[in-house]
């Protein structure tokens, strides 16, 4: 498999079109400022469709202009990235890596996050975005990629394990859902 990561003068750059195991053509690339409104719309849709993400749509205080600035910041970052997966020109999902911190003791660690529109679940887009973020994290020099996942989200846990992530802890009351009460979070990490 060809890497989509490119060295772009100290900036994280990713651009690749792939065909998933299910035969879906997916274009994955950096989110850029002009994507602000479509990424924001995708955020609201994905966060309304599932109880597995950290926030609810009504808790988001970003507008399209702020989302554009956020994406622009990511485009110019040497060690953080926000990727968008497109299927037939439509945003199917987003994923990204964020530095845990700049301090020496934690500079080797990054956090991974992902959200996929429900209509695209099980089609390989999550796997493709996860693999792309792993490539980018390695290229940025991280030694460890981390995530939290709701324990009931068996499909995501299986995908993360297939990608090499291992469980290192649990928080029985990690999330408090409006619908399900407390949800257990599993902390996972991938050594790069």
What is each PLM-predicted segment?
Residues 10-24, 179-192:
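Terminal substrate-recognition subdomain of acyl/acetyltransferases
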Residues 130, 137-148:
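Conserved GNAT acetyl-CoA-binding A-motif
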């Amino acid at each position: 498999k060809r890497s989509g990561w490119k060295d772009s003068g100290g900036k994280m750059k990713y651009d690749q079109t792939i065909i998933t195991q299910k035969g879906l053509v997916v274009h994955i690339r950096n989110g850029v400022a002009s994507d602000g409104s479509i990424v924001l719309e995708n955020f609201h849709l994905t966060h309304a469709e599932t109880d597995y993400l950290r926030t609810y749509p009504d808790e988001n205080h970003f507008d399209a202009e702020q989302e554009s600035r956020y994406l622009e910041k990511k485009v110019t970052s040497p060690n953080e990235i926000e990727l968008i997966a497109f299927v037939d020109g439509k945003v199917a999902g987003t994923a990204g890596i964020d530095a845990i911190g700049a301090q020496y003791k934690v500079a080797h660690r990054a956090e991974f996050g992902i959200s996929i529109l429900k209509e695209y679940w099980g089609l390989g887009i999550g796997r493709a975005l996860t693999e792309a973020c792993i490539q980018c994290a390695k290229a940025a020099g991280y030694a460890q990629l981390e995530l939290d996942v709701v324990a009931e989200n068996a499909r995501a846990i299986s995908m993360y394990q297939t990608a090499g992530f291992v469980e290192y802890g649990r928080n029985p009351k990690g999330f408090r859902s409006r619908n399900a009460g407390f949800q257990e979070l599993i902390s996972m990490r991938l050594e790069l």
